[in-house]
């Protein structure tokens, strides 16, 4: 595969760079809650007003309808200009809810929701995991009973990132009573303001409250909110996870590459205090970041693609992120880390522990790679 940018792509890059450098917010993004929502949506609105929202989304729903190469250019220039991290509260909207609606939604669902996302009028969260159903998602029990033209939802989700500030949720529930495993599930658009929904935020070890438990008590959701066919939610969910693990990595790996460059610069400034072992780790991580970039682009443009390809990218990204933030801690030293509580490396280091859990744990990604991509036998007598 050859991946090259055209003359037109380069002109687009120049234009994007000029706009970003003049418009990227100078304030740091708040970590969670309503302030994080307001900050993230303001940034989307600013992009939307200037015609930069939804680079590769279909023009029919308010996007620019440009190639995915242009989307990549946008991510690269955003990171270079110091734009807010793509892992902000709009991450689900832009990286998997919107793309899932584009791939599987009805005309009515697309026309209503996609322009709202692009205009910064709505935030989404993802309600897949349950207290006893994380890695084994197919065992989920939150139910949706069909009653006339509504589903009546009862149960509980957990680890729902930004549930406290989201307007809509990708909700995966069991709609066929008595069904087992992957069968009988539905992927439903849930309005987070509906009566019967209770959100209880959970604080993580970085001291940030950005995920939550969500309880559903006779929540009535119109059947027209089912995405794809009723009881066929597993296929839609696999589409969502495919986006979460592959295309979503585009923006994140660009950001990670910028982090390792910043670390290299920091090491150059402290050259007298940095030993050869640390320099070696930085050099290896820099090479791995370049390899991750090549791997991400290869996966994005692979044909035919499968929903499992993203697991390789997701796993490599997650473990590399942890290595890079560990290097940052070793380079800074404990005294510098403690002395500067607003230092952005410390929260990033703490948050990176979750990279090998969120979106499917490292063990689950390895299982998928082994079983679905390499065709190895299923292990452990499952
Ligand atoms: C920061 C963060 C944000 C998240 N945001 C969301 C969100 O917005 N929406 C959402 O729905 N979920 C979210 N999650 C939840 C995430 O998807 C789950 O935590 C993840 O899928 C693991 O599930 P679990 O926590 O139930 O762990 P478990 O499934 O109980 O796993 C426990 C351990 O057992 C291992 N294990 C389990 N099964 C196997 C197996 N078959 N083979 C080998 N090892 C196995 C796991 O790898 C893990 O180490 C988030 C998680 C994190 C950390």
Annotated model-derived regions:
Residues 2, 69, 73-77, 96, ...:
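Glycine-rich phosphate/cofactor-binding loops in nucleotide/flavin-utilizing enzymes
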Residues 3-5, 197-291, 355:
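Glycine-rich beta->alpha junctions and the first turn(s) of the following alpha-helix
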Residues 28-34, 268-279, 289-343:
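C-terminal helix-coil-helix/basic helical segment that borders enzyme active sites and/or dimer interfaces
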Residues 48-111, 115-120, 162-168, 289, ...:
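Internal helix-loop-helix
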Residues 94, 134, 158-163, 205-206, ...:
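Glycine-rich phosphate/pyrophosphate-binding beta-alpha loops
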Residues 120-128, 172:
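A short, Trp-centered hydrophobic/proline-enriched beta-strand micro-motif
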Residues 142-145:
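A structural signal for short hydrophobic beta-strand segments in well-ordered beta-sheet cores
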Residues 149-150, 154-200:
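A short core secondary-structure module
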């Amino acid at each position: 595969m050859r991946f090259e940018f055209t003359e037109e792509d380069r002109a687009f890059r120049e234009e994007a760079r000029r706009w970003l450098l003049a418009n990227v917010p100078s304030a740091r993004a708040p970590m969670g809650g309503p302030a994080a929502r307001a900050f993230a949506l303001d940034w989307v609105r600013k992009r939307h007003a200037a015609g930069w929202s939804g680079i590769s989304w279909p023009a029919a729903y308010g996007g620019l309808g440009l190639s995915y190469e242009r989307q990549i250019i946008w991510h690269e220039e955003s990171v270079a200009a110091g734009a807010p991290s793509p892992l902000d509260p709009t991450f689900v909207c832009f990286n998997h809810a919107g793309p899932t609606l584009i791939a599987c939604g009805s005309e009515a669902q697309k026309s209503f929701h996609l322009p709202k996302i692009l205009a910064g009028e709505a935030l989404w969260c993802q309600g897949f995991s349950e207290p006893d159903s994380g890695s084994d998602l197919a065992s989920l029990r939150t139910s949706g009973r069909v009653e006339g033209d509504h589903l009546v939802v009862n149960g509980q989700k957990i680890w729902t990132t930004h549930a406290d500030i989201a307007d809509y949720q990708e909700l995966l529930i069991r709609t066929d009573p008595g069904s087992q495993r992957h069968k009988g599930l539905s992927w439903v658009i849930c309005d987070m303001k509906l009566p019967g929904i209770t959100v209880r935020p959970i604080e993580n070890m970085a001291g940030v409250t950005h995920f939550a438990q969500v309880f559903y008590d006779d929540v009535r959701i119109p059947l027209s909110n089912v995405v794809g066919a009723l009881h066929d939610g597993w296929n839609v969910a696999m589409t969502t996870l495919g986006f979460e693990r592959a295309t979503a990595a585009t923006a994140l790996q660009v950001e990670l590459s910028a982090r390792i460059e910043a670390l290299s610069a920091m090491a150059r400034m402290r050259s007298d205090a940095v030993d050869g072992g640390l320099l070696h780790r930085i050099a290896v991580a820099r090479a791995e970041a370049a390899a991750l970039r090549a791997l991400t682009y290869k996966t994005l443009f692979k044909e035919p693609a499968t929903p499992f390809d993203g697991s390789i990218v997701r796993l490599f990204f997650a473990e590399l992120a942890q290595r890079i933030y560990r290097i940052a801690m070793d380079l800074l030293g404990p005294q510098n880390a403690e002395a500067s509580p607003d230092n952005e490396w410390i929260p990033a280091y703490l948050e990176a522990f979750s990279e090998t859990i969120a979106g499917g744990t490292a063990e689950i990604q390895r299982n998928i790679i082994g079983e679905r991509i390499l065709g190895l036998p299923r292990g452990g007598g499952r």
